[in-house]
Amino acid sequence: MKTENINHAFLDGVLDGTHDDVYYHFGVASSDPVLDKLRDVRAVIMAGSGGRINEFTERWSELNAGTEIVAFPKEDRFVTRYTAGVLFASHGMGMPSASIALQELMRMVFFLKRGDLEAMDEVFWCRVGTSGGVGLPGGTVVVSSEGLMADLKPYRLLNGGTGEYWFDGHFPAATSQAIIAANEHTDFDIISGTTIAGNEFFLEQFRLDGAICLETPETKMGWLTWLHDNGVANIEMEGAMIAGYLNH
């Protein structure tokens, strides 16, 4: 079974041994024996920083009777760990960096699941990170229902000089609701809401402390009020792209 949204022209050749797939920024290739340990991957958890990945992995290993932690050799770009069915990977900051990590991780999962669409569909994907809340108390956990860019439109890329590629920014509603339900007895606030992904840390987030500043306190508050009025719960830098690529 195939889907036109998957690059079978390249990926099928990896499965039949015509060529390797080199996950360059992770320092491994499809021919590396280390990937055999990842065949039972059930979830991919992404985060911005490598330090957070180490913390997640060590804690998950402890919760699973000290299961072996597998580390990829290359860490100058992204830090990657695997233990107890979960692949943890950092993606850096912002959609350009995160898109590199996500593209290579998606190719890797395709290889690990031998192109089986049903098996790939069972893999849970999640990004965990810090964000700025919009009208929320500090410490509130936001489970994203949709990822949009700073203009409240979905993620899109330039298609040369001919137009744009647009991507669907919705996250699976049932998954979001299940995460919230599983945490209803915790001691922190958890809600669902729209997440804005800024494509630039200072300008697109209307910050006033950049070397280049094009906004005023008035325009910043106007933007934040507009976001709040349109159901936005938080602001970060990757969600719109991650939703778009995984939906595709």
Show the residue positions of the predicted features.
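A C-terminal functional module that forms or caps the active site or interfaces directly
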Residues: 221-248
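Conserved protein kinase catalytic core
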Residues: 133-135, 203, 244
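A short glycine-rich, hydrophobically flanked beta-strand micro-motif that places a catalytic Asp/Glu
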Residues: 126, 194, 235
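Active-site rim beta-loop-alpha module in soluble metabolic enzymes
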Residues: 168-231
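Histidine- and/or cysteine-centered catalytic micro-motif in compact active-site loops
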Residues: 131, 146-147, 195-200, 240
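Metabolite-binding pocket within alpha/beta catalytic cores that recognizes anionic/polar moieties
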Residues: 1-180
